[in-house]
Amino acid sequence: MSHSLVVVIPDLRAEHSARLREAAARFGFECHICSSSAQSRRFLPEAEVILSADHSLAGQAPNLKWMCSHFAGVDPFLKEGVFASPEAILSNSSGAYGVTISEHIVMLLLDILRRNPEYQRNIQQRAWIRRLPIRSIYGSRILMLGTGDIGQEACRRLRAFEPSFIKGVNFHGNNPGNLFDQVKTPEKLDSLLADTDLLIISLPGTKATFHMISTPQLRLLPGHAVIINVGRGTVVDQAALEEELQNGRLYAGLDVFENEPLSAESVLWDSPRAVITPHVAGDTSLQHTVDRIVNLFLEDFENYCTGRPLLRQIDRSIGY
């Protein structure tokens, strides 16, 4: 059986396809670039490598050896029975989304701090109301849950606004690039929350991060604190957050939710204390993101074909 690479990514340009085909040919792979998952299905029985975020493809590829998600988050791939080939390795595209998602973080923060949703509602009613007190990132105390690519890129951008400090939380306690003023492990999280004005979450959805922010943590935050979540919705206990917002505490900028799409009954749709976007912070219509996805994959594709370890391989037991 010949080696086979199957690619299903939206927004690929011709130059991306050409580079993928060239790399595949160099290492003796047939390359099938498909516009949809449905189109890819006839190639799956012989697929050795798949580049796609559609976890359902892994269950239809009995000869799969490597599944590379073009997303950074891989939680759908971690469920029991997803892979038809249990020994298949899994990797992600961490490093592709830092630019676009960090810009989304800044947008959500400024939207809330500068009261833009309220101004827009007033404008739609042709009401010229100018006296809405605003706040600033300048001088704010920032805590970032997650110090990977997204957290680091956000930290770089937020430094320009001159906050009082930017602290981080990760599972290793290391300070990547010494970007953060201080980094702690999750065991110290509660002790950091009382001194936090802006809480920014970019953590993956894993067993260890499930409801890391729930009622006890929300109650430790100052009432004026802003929570931004661009990681996974399961990191925040959504019901607990909704209750705090309804009680007039906290503000939230959310791109991810516990269940997606967000239920039409959710109070978040109409909450004056929330700004929501429909999981679009990492949208691949930004060509820089697709460029990065392809570059990162080709780097690991060469590693795979030459017997070297993958740089972005996921430990499926912990989810990152």
Name the predicted role of every residue range:
Residues 46-120:
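Phosphate/diphosphate ligand-binding glycine-rich loop within oxidoreductases
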Residues 102-118, 160-161, 295-303, 308:
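Oxidoreductase and adenylate-handling cofactor-binding alpha/beta cores
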Residues 164, 173-267:
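Rossmann-like adenosine-cofactor binding region
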Residues 224, 230-320:
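Rossmann-like dinucleotide-binding domain for NAD(H)/NADP(H)
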